[in-house]
């Protein structure tokens, strides 16, 4: 409540900052921090899409549309509980019937096995990305704490500027106290914003998801290469 009242006072009783300023480092880091903080939901949506595309979206709709052209409704239900990889594995398993050509059966068997492995690799990818989504959720709380410290820094700057503008020698002790509070708050806030941005923050999440995606696609290629 005290901070809220202070923010109201700062809006009503505006001052021109002549003697105090945030450092260039602070302003540069804050610019990046705010950009990333404001795009966290987009990042989460993007990761969620990577985790779920095999169960829905335009890719699955196209597959179902193609199947509907050649399959009955009961046949469609055969694929309804499968992801696109498992679904294609089932299609290929149907080509391993003993009354089919041996060459077709062999291709069907190998391809079915490959896509079953791809489906398992995707499940692993999804599980690992799920942990990154949990990191993003915890980062929302970190952003709230960081924004609170940013507000504190603004308040200290405001109070320091007013104390300096009073030009009263008797206020020098208060000026020194507020100067220390302001500088310490700036330092803490920069550190918190850098943590949010860097390897322990959003950059780390994006890097790990990228690496997980590389690993998944490499495993997929290996599985398909074995069908040759």
UniProtKB/Swiss-Prot annotation:
UniProt entry keywords in alphabetical sequence: Glycoprotein, Sporulation
Glycan attachment residues as annotated in the record: 117
Record's subcellular location: Spore wall
Example GO biological process: sporulation resulting in formation of a cellular spore
InterPro entries: AH/BAR_dom_sf
Family affiliation: Belongs to the SWP12 family.
Name this protein carries in UniProt: Spore wall protein 12
Gene designation per UniProt: SWP12
């Amino acid at each position: 409540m005290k901070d809220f009242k202070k923010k109201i006072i700062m809006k009503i009783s505006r001052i021109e900052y002549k003697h105090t300023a945030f450092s260039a480092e602070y302003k540069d880091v804050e610019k990046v921090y705010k950009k990333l903080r404001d795009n966290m939901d987009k990042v989460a949506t993007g990761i969620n899409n990577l985790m779920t595309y095999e169960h829905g979206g335009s890719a699955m709709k196209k597959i179902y549309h193609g199947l509907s052209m050649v399959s009955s409704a009961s046949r469609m239900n055969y694929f309804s509980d499968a992801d696109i990889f498992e679904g294609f594995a089932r299609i290929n398993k149907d080509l391993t019937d003993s009354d089919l050509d041996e060459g077709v059966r062999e291709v069907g068997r190998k391809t079915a096995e490959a896509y079953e492995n791809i489906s398992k690799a995707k499940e692993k990818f999804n599980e690992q990305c799920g942990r990154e989504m949990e990191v993003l959720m915890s980062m929302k709380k970190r952003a709230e704490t960081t924004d609170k410290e940013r507000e504190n820094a603004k308040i200290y700057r405001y109070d320091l500027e007013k104390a300096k503008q009073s030009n009263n020698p008797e206020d020098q002790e208060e000026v020194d106290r507020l100067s220390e509070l302001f500088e310490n708050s700036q330092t803490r806030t920069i550190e918190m914003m850098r943590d949010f941005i860097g390897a322990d923050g959003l950059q780390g999440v994006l890097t790990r998801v990228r690496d997980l995606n590389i690993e998944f696609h490499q495993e997929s290629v290996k599985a398909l290469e074995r069908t040759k």
